[in-house]
Structures are given as C-alpha cells and as structure tokens.
Amino acid sequence: MEKKASILMNRYELGRMLGQGTFAKVYHARNLASNQSVAIKVIDKEKVLRVGMIDQIKREISIMRLVRHPNIVQLHEVMASKSKIYFAMEYVRGGELFSRVARGRLKEDAARKYFQQLIGAVDFCHSRGVYHRDLKPENLLVDENGNLKVSDFGLSAFKECQKQDGLLHTTCGTPAYVAPEIINKRGYDGAKADIWSCGVILFVLLAGYLPFHDSNLMEMYRKISKGDVKFPQWFTTDVRRLLSRLLDPNPNIRITVEKLVEHPWFKKGYKPAVMLSQPNESNNLKDVHTAFSADHKDNEGKAKEPASSLKPVSLNAFDIISLSKGFDLSGLFENDKEQKADSRFMTQKPASAIVSKLEQIAETESFKVKKQDGLVKLQGSKEGRKGQLAIDAEIFEVTPSFFVVEVKKSAGDTLEYEKFCNKGLRPSLRDICWDGQSEHPSLAQSSTLTQSSKSISRHAI
C-alpha cells in the first residue's frame, strides 16, 4: 500500500504495518469516528483472482461473521476498492501466543487458562458448523487483559464442505499440528482434527517445544501417525492422561469436547465465556458482495453500499416434490446425529397466519420475536451451552395461496435446537402444514413451475 493513502475510505487512518503474507498485509489503524484501534487486513484482488482464491476469501468473510465469540478475533466490516479488499478487524494488542512460548514454557495454570479459552472458542465454531483446520500458537493472539483470541480463518471449512461420507478431504494445516488422519490422506472429521491440534498446542504451552519434531518431514509424519510422543518429567499425571487422549492417533476414540470439558484438569478454575450477541446473518451476503463487486471507488472514495434486499430463493420441481408430505421430516424433526442446516414445510395458510403462529410459539417458549427483511427471528431468552438459541423462519410465496416456510438455527447449541423443535415447534406447526393428500389446484395449474426452476418471492412481513 502506498504511504500517501493514509486515510482509507474516509473511515480509517492507517498506521504501521503489523505483518504480511503472500496475498495480504495487515496494518494498525484508527477509526476516525470512534477513535477505536483496529487491524486492517489488505488483500490484493488481482493476486486472489489470479490463483483462484475467490471462494476462500468469501468463505473467510462468511465464517468470521458467523463465529462471534469473546475468544475469537471479530470482523467489524468489509470494504473494497477496484484493486483491494479491506477487512476491518478487532485489534489485539498482546500479539501472538507463540512469542510468549518462544521465551519459555508456561506455568500450568497459565497454560490451562489459555487452553480453556481455546477449547471454548473451538467448541463454539463447531456448534456453528465451522472447522478451523489450522490451529497453532501463531494463529492465537493475546489481548491486553491476557485473554486468548483465535485468528486466521483462511483455511477454515464449513460443515457443508463434507462429502457424501460425511468427512472432509482437503489436506491443509501446518505439518507439526496436523492430525494423523489428514496426513494419511483419509477423509477426516473436522472437529476431531481440530481437537488433535488443540492437544499439540497444549503440549507446546506446557513443554516449550513440539511433541512431534524431526528434521526429516517423513519421519515426523511417522511419529504423528503412531502418536509417538514422550512427555517431559515435569508433566503431572493428570496432564499426561489428558494429552494421551487428545493425541490419540485413532480419531474414533480421541477425546471429544463434551468429554474434555468434564476432565478434572480442564475444569479447575474454568469460567465459560459470556457470549456476544449474534449479528444479522444477511451481513454475510452484504460483505461478500462488497468484497467482490467491481463497481467501487478508489481508496480515497467512499465504499459503495450493497443493495439491502436479498436475492429471492429459487425452488425447482425436485424441491417441491420433496415437500409433498408437508414437512421435510429428515432435517428438522428426526433425531439424526447430523442436523440439517435448514428445513422447510408447505402451507396454504396466509403469511399473516404463519407469523401469528410463530409469535404464539415464541410466547409459549419465552422467545423474543423480531420481524425483519422477510424473516421472523425467534431469539431465546435463556443462556444455553453456546449462548442464546436463535431461529430464523423465512416465508416464500409459491402462488398467492401457497407458501413455503424455511426454518433454520442461526445461533446456539444444536442439541438445544433439536429439543426445541421436537417439543415446541413440531407439535405447534402441525395444524398449519399442508397435508399433501389432495393436490393443490393452483400449484397443479402452474406447469412452468413444476417443470423448471423458478424464483419464489419472499413474502413481505
């Protein structure tokens, strides 16, 4: 970036460079309106386009918007010029955790605190269907209050990236921290791979060096694959037992987060984080649009705001056929281990009746209701394991007298969501669902809709 461009988008005053990589530079900056310190990540659009990293940048934006947690670096906003993409992010003053470990191993209580915060952040990511895949001390920052912040979601994956076998298959991560199943190029569970990396990090914090290290990369991979680790003499028995379960080369018997948080060593002095409020999920689409829209002014100009309306969802014949029984029971109401991201049901009731029914459910279950941008948002009042449960219901008009309602969890714990669906949502919505026994006349007449993909308008609320 040129030195003369000290004011960015009339919003930020750029300062010194904090670091740089192949495709981006990070600067300290000051918000001109609030005087708040931020970190500005500057990404070269041309380089990103040349190497085909557009999808990765889009995914990083979506993930950072999705994972709002006290121990995760927050994304404030996304801006762009014709040649650059700018991430305005939370500025973490303390620097990398790696630099602290480089000065020597940490005391057990200090290591435990960082590890507890790391697991809290990772568990939250997993609850949102996000796997980091590159956890290491260099990607863990420490703020001025000594709290850990997870950063760099550039290699992260969504749960939806899994193939038909339910596993991820992309090899990524830093060799010394990567799980055996990734090295062996088998399909892997992103959550279990992240837990392995957390185990390596805990070892490094307590020992001051890596558990698996060799000048020969293939020999290091052999040690990782076998879980061949030697503990230093100062490791306590509890630490050794915990690390043995974290660094188990068999992912099927490796300790899970649920078991980990109940471990005596982990529980000592543990204070769960106070969750942050979750943003409007439409910001994801706006930020992605901002980053890759070609119609932007240069650095000295103002960033162009994307359109506020969202593109209508398209449902084709196969979508409608799958809904012919009224409910898509496979996602919302079956006790599957893998919860679908969203579920739909069809109804002949008008939008006003649908909204009224959702408001009635919300009142019964002590949820707050917010109607915004074609969405009915239900916000739980109780703090759950992953913060407050939040559910979005979106209404689409197929014909003037036929509607599709899409329901999905936007925040909170999946198990708590399933419980709410089974005990609250499912019984209450039965009486407004289309039973599918008699063909809907106006739908039958709509031959163009049943033969090809057509847009369905979001009904105004």
From Swiss-Prot:
GO terms for molecular function: ATP binding; protein serine kinase activity; protein serine/threonine kinase activity. Residues 152-181 are annotated as: Activation loop. Residues 340-369 are annotated as: PPI. Its cofactor is Mn(2+). PROSITE patterns: NAF, PROTEIN_KINASE_ATP, PROTEIN_KINASE_DOM, PROTEIN_KINASE_ST. It comes from the Eukaryota. The active site is at D134. The keyword Nucleus does not apply. Induction: By drought stress and abscisic acid (ABA). It catalyses: L-seryl-[protein] + ATP = O-phospho-L-seryl-[protein] + ADP + H(+); L-threonyl-[protein] + ATP = O-phospho-L-threonyl-[protein] + ADP + H(+). Pfam families: NAF, Pkinase. ATP binds at L18, G19, Q20, G21, T22, F23, A24, K25, V26, K41. Its EC number is 2.7.11.1. Residues 300-334 form the NAF domain. Residues 442-455 have a biased composition (Low complexity). The activation loop within the kinase domain is the target of phosphorylation/activation by upstream protein kinases. The PPI motif mediates the interaction with the ABI (abscisic acid-insensitive) phosphatases. CIPK serine-threonine protein kinases interact with CBL proteins. Binding of a CBL protein to the regulatory NAF domain of CIPK protein lead to the activation of the kinase in a calcium-dependent manner. This is CBL-interacting protein kinase 5.
